[in-house]
């Protein structure tokens, strides 16, 4: 009888211990061709429709215009944010046509802190956009067309993210390189690819190239992908949007 009572006490105590629940999040990366579709129409609502279909928590956008002549002074990230109900964070990489051309993050909640870091780019300057959301850090980038510049981006990326060594880190974007390249081999010494390395994302109609990626920093209890989706065929951009479900 006494044994039974102690057993019940122990079981009750165990039931009262809170369990650590894994966090789940959907991420998307999307090169939006400055907001202009393959039909040469500026239609941010079409891009927003692609985003809303997946309902990601955070979206990394590349080739994002702000106040340029070719889009008649519009702020592309802001227009898409308005259609999706998300918060826009912008990083201009270069001055262009009276405005800026760069990258952006859309998020369901505003980041707690934002950092903009220049990256190597000889044909045009490149940028790393870092958003701290508390439990995790999400970054957006659009890497150089030149392999040497891409290689030289890795030390900068590692140095910047060292600040967040106690947080889970995700980097998304158009890396302008293939999964089996020398650059990706070097990058994967420090980062794990969460997206597919065999499913192409460019061009939009009949994809043949894998150049858009979602990666995470290697380490103990690193995040893992639980699902992925690539939407093919939309004229909203020349790239396909890539979504990855992650657990961390």
Protein language model features and the residues they cover:
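Surface-exposed cleft-lining segments at the edges of enzyme active sites
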Residues: 34-36, 115-118, 141-147
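N-terminal, active-site-proximal structural segment of metallo-dependent hydrolase catalytic domains
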Residues: 2-6, 18-83, 95-99, 233, ...
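Bacterial N-terminal signal peptides
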Residues: 8-16
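Metal-dependent phosphoester-hydrolase catalytic domains
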Residues: 116-117, 147-151, 159-170, 176-248
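Active-site beta-strand/loop signature of hydrolases that rely on acidic residues for catalysis
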Residues: 25-32, 47-71, 138-141, 157-183, ...
């Amino acid at each position: 009888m006494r044994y039974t009572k102690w057993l019940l006490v122990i079981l009750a105590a165990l039931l009262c211990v809170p369990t650590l629940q894994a966090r789940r999040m959907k991420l998307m990366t999307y090169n939006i061709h400055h907001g202009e579709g393959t039909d040469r129409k500026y239609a941010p609502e079409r891009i927003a429709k692609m985003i809303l279909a997946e309902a990601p928590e955070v979206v990394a956008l590349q080739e994002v215009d702000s106040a340029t002549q070719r889009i008649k002074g519009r702020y592309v990230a802001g227009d898409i944010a308005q259609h999706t109900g998300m918060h826009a964070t912008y990083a201009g990489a270069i001055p262009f046509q009276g405005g800026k051309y760069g990258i952006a993050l859309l998020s369901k909640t505003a980041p707690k802190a934002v950092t903009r870091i220049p990256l190597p780019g000889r044909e045009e300057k490149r940028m790393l956009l870092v958003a701290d959301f508390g439990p995790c850090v999400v970054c957006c980038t659009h890497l150089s067309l030149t392999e040497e510049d891409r290689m030289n981006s890795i030390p900068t990326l590692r140095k910047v993210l060292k600040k967040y060594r106690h947080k889970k880190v995700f980097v998304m974007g158009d890396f302008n390189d293939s999964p089996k390249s020398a650059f990706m081999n070097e990058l994967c010494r420090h980062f794990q690819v969460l997206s597919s390395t065999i499913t192409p994302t460019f061009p939009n109609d009949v994809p043949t190239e894998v150049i858009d990626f979602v990666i995470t920093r290697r380490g103990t209890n690193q995040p893992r992908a639980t699902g992925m989706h690539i939407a093919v065929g939309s004229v909203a951009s020349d790239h396909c949007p890539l979504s990855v479900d992650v657990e961390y």
